[in-house]
Amino acid sequence: QAPWPDTISPP
């Protein structure tokens, strides 16, 4: 699981 939602891109 990524530390951000799958609906947004990482910084």
Curated annotation (Swiss-Prot):
Annotated compartments: Secreted
Could you list this entry's UniProt keywords, alphabetically sorted: Hypotensive agent, Metalloenzyme inhibitor, Metalloprotease inhibitor, Protease inhibitor, Pyrrolidone carboxylic acid, Secreted
- Signal peptide as annotated in the record: none
MF term (GO), any: peptidase inhibitor activity
Entry's Gene Ontology BP terms: regulation of blood pressure
* Modification sites for Pyrrolidone carboxylic acid: Q1
Which tissues does it occur in? Expressed by the venom gland.
Q: What is its main location?
A: secreted
Listed under GO cellular component are: extracellular region
- Function of the protein: This peptide potentiates the effects of bradykinin on smooth muscle, and inhibits the angiotensin-converting enzyme (ACE) in vitro.
Q: Please give the family membership noted in the entry.
A: Belongs to the bradykinin-potentiating peptide family.
Name of the protein in question: Bradykinin-potentiating peptide S
